[in-house]
């Protein structure tokens, strides 16, 4: 069975390693995803998310651009194994040539600094999907509420049904829809998700989210 994986953080981990002088490669590494693991797992497509931690990075856009460079540098080194896709036709071509496919995606709309021009720049560079938020409020919207209980090391997320998309967030989802960039609602709060439904017409995805009920 062919595998399509909607999200991984491999590129950011490779960049962090390289900035420390490391030599980890997309071909083989101790992370969850590398080309050898993908080939063994019969992968069709891997989405490579570029994640920026807004509270730890001074210039989110500049850091994201470093990850874009890492994405292309790593994957273009193995053209016989994997090809970068921007369209459905690219995916079909890779399938016909026996190659796996990679798609560039963005995790944290705040890396666009509230500027649709930067969103379009990411699209021109090949990004085809983006989450509007991560775990922090940004120019576009809000995550669900976090509560850290005594004795627990990881916060619990509680539904936020009050704070929808900002005006800038609405502008972004409409521009993403115009461009053909997939809206990813993972990490977005409940009110924001309802606004995505209200202000867009095309399908959207939740790339790495769990269902509350089955």
Which sequence ranges carry the predicted segments?
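Active-site metal-binding loops of divalent metal-dependent hydrolases
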Residues: 8, 188, 209
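N-terminal hydrophobic targeting/anchoring segments and the immediately downstream early-domain regions
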Residues: 1-154, 158-159, 212-214
